[in-house]
């Protein structure tokens, strides 16, 4: 089986760069690449393939209109899957209305949002997140900004002391 990926930030991630980047944000893609390879699925960014004829699935991690229109012209619409990797706060059209609209453009949609799941068209997937373990850093070494939100301003004025050293 062959899988092609249309990556987000296409220019910086083409030629399989998204699978080789060392930043922690790319850890899910590195893991996806190795897992696919282990079970015999060939996966590359779409620009690596010479021909799209033998590709089984094309995953869009971003809506790239250049590739979308090219693939529609090449009759690949039944191979295209959109992956709504980010929440709607990051990409606004990953909202419920946006996903409903995307259903008319893609054969399948993968989303992390359980409320957007629809039988036969929209499927759930678990987005892995990797965090760096933070250590104990003293406030003297760390530039620190604290925000306090209060609802009763009278209480704050009455009980607040100001640190003049800041």
Model-assigned labels for residue ranges:
Residues 1-166:
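Nucleotide-sugar donor-binding catalytic core of glycosyltransferases
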């Amino acid at each position: 089986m062959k899988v092609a990926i249309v990556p987000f930030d296409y220019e910086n991630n083409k030629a399989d760069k998204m699978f080789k980047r060392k930043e922690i944000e790319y850890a899910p893609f590195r893991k996806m690449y190795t897992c696919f390879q282990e079970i015999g699925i060939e996966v590359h960014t779409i620009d690596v393939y010479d021909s799209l004829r033998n590709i089984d699935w094309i995953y869009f991690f971003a809506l790239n209109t250049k590739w979308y229109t090219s693939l529609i012209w090449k009759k690949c619409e039944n191979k295209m899957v959109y992956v709504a990797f980010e929440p709607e706060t990051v990409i606004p059209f990953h909202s419920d209305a946006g996903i409903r609209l995307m259903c008319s453009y893609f054969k399948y949609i993968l989303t992390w949002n359980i409320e957007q799941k629809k039988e036969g068209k929209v499927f759930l997937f678990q987005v892995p997140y990797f965090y760096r373990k933070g250590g104990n850093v003293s406030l003297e070494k760390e530039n620190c900004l604290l925000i306090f939100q209060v609802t009763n301003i009278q209480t704050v004025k009455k009980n607040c002391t100001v640190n003049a050293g800041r």
